[in-house]
Amino acid sequence: MGRKRLSDFGNARLACHDVSCLRGDRLLFTHLSFEVKAGEAVLITGANGIGKSSLLRLLAGFLKPFSGHIEKWGRVAFADEALAMDRHLPLEKALAYWAALDGVLGAEKEAMAVMALDILADSPVRLLSTGQRKRAVLARLLASQAAIWLLDEPANGLDAASVRALIEMIEHHRQKGGIILAVSHQGLDMADYKTLSLENFVANSGQSSGFFDLLDESHFS
């Protein structure tokens, strides 16, 4: 399905070229090649322990490929269960700190409003509930204004209203030409996303090197 794109992230792109991932003495996946373009969303699937989260960390630059290489056009933001904020700061100041590092002063205010956190602006981070902490993680992601979002279980800990806000946030990001790569056991109700199954790239699976055709999945009504 076509979508109108704004110019914000129109040049965003991410590509893996024959990438293999080694954790400890275990080769998780190998010969993984794919490309994601501006406005696209990919859901990474596979059994527990197959390397879904490790792939996101490779794409974020936290890990190095055992072989192959990764190319990224556009800034990257990564979100998982870790809050990574000063527990003693008020929430707004904690988010403002990261927004300043990303060079987007003031972006935290809109991000807090989107995730319904503005009422908690003066609350210390340490007092946030589990659900509020997860919304703070997503607010930090939004405030970063990065083109490429890497989401590891983004819906965990969210109530139904917050999940809807997350999906709206994702779709707005894509309309601007942003990229989404996500891992989610709960699934994400994203429009016309694609699926990348790591089952096809486990070591000794017989999958040949080369670009893998992502499977189109229509979940848009």
From Swiss-Prot:
Top-rank EC class of the record's enzyme: translocase
Catalytic activity: heme b(in) + ATP + H2O = heme b(out) + ADP + phosphate + H(+)
Annotated PROSITE patterns: ABC_TRANSPORTER_2, CCMA
Main location: membrane
Record-level GO cellular component terms: plasma membrane
Swiss-Prot/TrEMBL GO biological process terms: cytochrome complex assembly
InterPro entries (alphabetical): AAA+_ATPase (IPR003593), ABC_transporter-like_ATP-bd (IPR003439), ABC_transptr_haem_export_CcmA (IPR005895), P-loop_NTPase (IPR027417)
Membrane topology, as annotated: Peripheral membrane protein
Binding positions for ATP per the UniProt entry: G46, A47, N48, G49, I50, G51, K52, S53
Assigned EC number: 7.6.2.5
Single GO MF descriptor: ATP hydrolysis activity
Domain of life assignment: Bacteria
Keyword list, A-Z: ATP-binding, Cell inner membrane, Cell membrane, Cytochrome c-type biogenesis, Membrane, Nucleotide-binding, Translocase, Transport
Domain ABC transporter as annotated: residue spans: 14-221
Assembly and oligomerization: The complex is composed of two ATP-binding proteins (CcmA) and two transmembrane proteins (CcmB).
Cross-referenced NCBIfam families: ccmA
Family statement: Belongs to the ABC transporter superfamily. CcmA exporter (TC 3.A.1.107) family.
Function of the protein: Part of the ABC transporter complex CcmAB involved in the biogenesis of c-type cytochromes; once thought to export heme, this seems not to be the case, but its exact role is uncertain. Responsible for energy coupling to the transport system.
Name of the protein in its database record: Cytochrome c biogenesis ATP-binding export protein CcmA
Gene (UniProt): ccmA
